[in-house]
UniProtKB/Swiss-Prot annotation:
Family: Belongs to the BRINP family.
Region forming the signal peptide: 1-33
UniProt keyword annotations, A-Z: Cell cycle, Glycoprotein, Growth arrest, Mitochondrion, Secreted, Signal
GO process terms (BP): cellular response to retinoic acid; central nervous system neuron differentiation; exploration behavior; multicellular organism growth; negative regulation of cell cycle; negative regulation of mitotic cell cycle; nervous system development; positive regulation of neuron differentiation
Protein name: BMP/retinoic acid-inducible neural-specific protein 3
UniProt subcellular location: Secreted; Mitochondrion
Gene name, Swiss-Prot/TrEMBL: Brinp3
A single GO cellular-component term on record: extracellular region
Primary localization: secreted
UniProt xrefs under SUPFAM superfamilies: Growth factor receptor domain
SMART domains, per the entry: MACPF (SM00457)
Glycosylation sites recorded in the entry for this protein: 168, 337, 456, 562, 609, 641
């Protein structure tokens, strides 16, 4: 005998016989048994679509209807009674000495009518639709009784309209339903009355009772007179076998294909699996067989319900007592930026817990939405028309900080706008401005107010250190111009400066005094030993009202004919004095520092112009330039393209005459700037004896600017040189203790100023 059975079990048994698809499809029955919005996503999500006879079963139809109505939880309690164990001996007889199968002649006739090469449609019409896809091997007959409760948790948590707090209908909880379900088999009648009363009063539950077979009879004395039913449970399993085992070998594979197409594709197409993905190859009459429109529509409706729930969660958060109490505690006498609100937020533990509750609810909601969206894309990937998906954006703490600002500053005249901290303005509904309130002053560091004015909170009352109050605003206490103390810039533009340096124009030459005990200008000398020379301005004696800036250096060096000597120059700069010990070495050709440029002159001798161009980028103060001249011998290396240099004293033949050298002239290019030492001394005197209130701060600001501008012109290096101390020591003739006191006062004052960063310097002058 052949038994029909629900397609979920049919599919699991049938697939076990099709070897190439076994590993891919073993999870189908598990997916069918899961809740629609919680099952694991896989290439076979389409199995839960409206395809095949499985979706025509009563149990699944009830399940889908309840799910679409919002019933998200199901409680089921049941008991069963198994009396008779039945077995099918058809397969056993076939394997026993070739005995004929005890099958109906009609079944054999339909097999013969199929022929040797039937189409899938012929197999479906002649076998599957008449006899099903499986037959029963063994089962248990008996009876069962069950109670199923579908619960809508959202409606269950809401109190019925018009009900009082003391009524029983308003106190229904999940615990109550648990207790009622557990008492069903103890006191069936009273339990059903109670459940039906709750179902009518709250519409939050749906109750279904099933009683079949002998167990469902009220009179247990006459069990044999009641027709038994198949009992399926972990203890009483139904064993099915695919119908193809009863067919000839040439029909078995085609039958499996036809059965899968019938179950999975509802006979609207051919079932195909490829690369771990399965779908239906639709027939011409059913172009949308892969598109489960009903399931897609249900999921879109679920997304709409999620959007409504999302709005309700946010609205409940704004209407909560914790949110309202937090808003009342916010200070109104100064402007609250998002950082300040966040700090106050972290201080309110009740408000934090309420926000965490909102976050947890939102996370669960968005996880559910993402599962639905993933499933929706999976089901609709072969639809001709893709679904439109719109989900609300997740609101972070930054959104709520701006939302709180909107409640504070954009909530006038019954209109709520949106506040922007960047523009410090409100965007009101319908492009109006009536929602904007008067914004209080901003309290903070730097140019922000120290306090707001008590009579008008939109204006500053007091300011921070380094700022002054002007017309209700805090403006920086800008130091007066330092140009009358010391100059820094020239009127020449960069291009003009570059042109004059290239031409070695005498208009930018600084006339310095040449001093050397080792040599004289325009005189030949033996270059075997190091020669020392210097160019000094002696400003303390001759130019006390000027400081000088070096832009370049030029030397004209001549050698005797056929000389292999190569001049090597080392340059040291003393910014405001004359000694070598307080000079810094010029890093020629290191990193991005300029290198010497040699230009051959049209003279009988080997004469070259050696030019070092600093320009505006590398310009610096100078008082004395120390130049050390060494020479080396240039010889050809082992390779013709290489050159080897020797020191003259290290040459193989020290007695050999290496030639002579002379320097025709040395020029320093730069410019001189105004310098008033007496005015700076008077400025320093105000640190101890201020003229008026506030003049000490003004003097400190001016000295800070002079210090920073002087030190900014220090040579390149990891740390700046302390040129300002050299200026105080050599040009103002201050003692070491006075210099230390002034530097300490400037550092202490600079630390009080807002948004300032002090820097470390390297001492140059003792």
């Amino acid at each position: 005998m052949i038994w029909r059975r629900r397609a979920g079990a049919e599919l699991s048994s049938l697939m076990a016989l099709w070897e190439w698809i076994v590993l891919s499809l073993h999870c189908w029955v598990l997916a069918v048994a899961a809740v629609s919005d919680q099952h694991a996503t896989s290439p076979f999500d389409w199995l839960l679509s409206d395809k095949g006879p499985f979706h025509r079963s009563q149990e699944y139809t009830d399940f889908v209807d309840r799910s679409r109505q919002g019933f998200s939880t199901r409680y089921k309690i049941y008991r069963e009674f198994g009396r008779w164990k039945v077995n099918n001996l058809a397969v056993e007889r076939r394997n026993f000495l070739g005995s004929p199968l005890p099958l109906a002649p009609e079944f054999f006739r339909n097999i013969r009518l199929l022929g040797r090469r039937p189409t899938l449609q012929q197999i479906t019409e002649n076998l599957i639709k008449k006899y099903g896809t499986h037959f029963l091997l063994s089962a248990t007959l008996g009876g069962e009784e069950s109670l199923t409760i579908f619960v809508d948790k959202r409606k269950l948590s809401k109190r019925p309209e018009g009900s009082e707090t003391s009524t029983n209908s308003s106190s229904v909880t999940l615990e109550t339903l648990h207790q009622l379900a557990a008492s069903y088999f103890i006191d069936r009648d009273s339990t059903l009355r109670r459940l039906h009363h709750i179902q009518i009063a709250s519409t939050a539950i749906k109750v279904t009772e099933t009683r079949t077979g002998p167990l469902g009879c009220s009179n247990y004395d006459n069990l044999d007179s009641v027709s038994s039913v198949l009992v399926q449970s972990p203890e009483n399993k139904i064993q099915l076998q695919g119908l193809q085992v009863l067919l000839p070998d040439y029909l078995q594979e085609r039958f499996v294909q036809a059965a899968l197409s019938y179950i999975a594709c509802n006979s609207e197409g051919e079932f195909i699996c490829k690369e771990n993905d399965c779908w239906c190859l639709c027939g011409p009459k059913f172009p949308e067989c892969n598109c489960p429109s009903m399931d897609i529509q249900a999921m879109e409706e679920n997304l709409l319900r999620i959007t409504e729930t999302w709005k309700a969660y946010n609205s409940d958060f704004e209407d909560s007592d914790e949110f309202k109490f937090f808003m009342k505690r916010l200070p109104m006498n100064y402007f609250l930026n998002t950082s300040t609100i966040m700090h106050l937020w972290t201080m309110d533990s009740n408000f934090q817990r309420r926000y965490e509750q909102l976050e947890n609810s939102m996370k669960q909601l968005f996880l559910k939405a993402h599962r639905i969206v993933h499933k929706l894309f999976s089901l609709s990937k072969r639809c001709h028309k893709q679904p439109l998906i719109s989900l609300p954006r997740q609101r972070t703490s930054t959104y709520w900080l701006t939302r709180i600002q909107s409640f504070l500053y954009c909530n006038e005249n019954g209109l709520l706008g949106s506040f922007s901290e960047e523009t410090h303005s409100c965007t009101c509904p319908n492009d109006q401005v009536v929602c904007t309130a008067f914004l209080p002053c901003t309290v903070g560091d730097a140019s922000a107010c120290l306090t707001c004015a008590p009579d008008n909170r939109t204006r500053c009352g007091t300011c921070n250190t380094g700022y002054m109050l002007s017309q209700g605003l805090c403006k920086p206490e800008v130091a007066e111009s330092t140009d009358h103390y010391i100059g820094f810039e020239t009127d020449l533009q960069d291009l003009e400066m570059k042109y004059l340096l290239q031409k070695t124009d005498r208009r930018i030459e600084v006339h310095a005094i040449f001093i050397s005990n080792d040599m004289r200008l325009n005189s030949w000398f033996d270059p075997s030993w190091r020669k020392r020379m210097l160019l000094t301005l002696k400003s303390n004696k001759y130019k006390s009202s000027l400081v000088h800036m070096i832009l370049g250096l030029s030397l004209q060096i001549c050698l005797t004919k056929n000389s292999t000597l190569e001049p090597v120059l080392a340059v040291y700069i003393n910014p405001f004095g004359g000694s070598h010990s307080e000079s810094w070495f010029m890093p020629v050709s290191e990193s991005s520092f300029p290198d010497w440029e040699r230009t051959k002159l049209d003279l009988p001798l080997q004469c070259y112009n050696w030019t070092l161009t600093l320009g505006n980028k590398w310009k610096t103060f100078f008082e004395t330039v120390h130049i050390y001249l060494r020479s080396r011998i240039k010889a050809n290396g082992p390779n013709s393209n290489e050159s080897i240099y020797y020191e003259p004293l290290e040459f193989i033949d020290p007695s050999r005459n290496l030639g002579y050298m002379k320097i025709n002239n040395i020029q320093v290019f730069g410019y001189s700037m105004h310098f008033d030492p007496e005015a700076i001394r008077d400025l320093i005197l105000q640190l101890d004896y201020p003229y008026t209130q506030g003049s000490q701060d003004s003097a400190l600001l001016q000295l800070l600017e002079i210090r920073d501008r002087v030190n900014k012109l220090s040579p390149p290096g990891q740390r700046r040189l302390d040129l300002f101390s050299c200026l105080l020591r050599h040009r103002l003739k201050l003692s070491t203790s006075e210099v230390v006191r002034i530097q300490s006062a400037l550092q202490a004052f600079n630390a009080k100023l807002p948004n300032t960063v002090d820097y470390d310097t390297t001492k140059l002058c003792s």
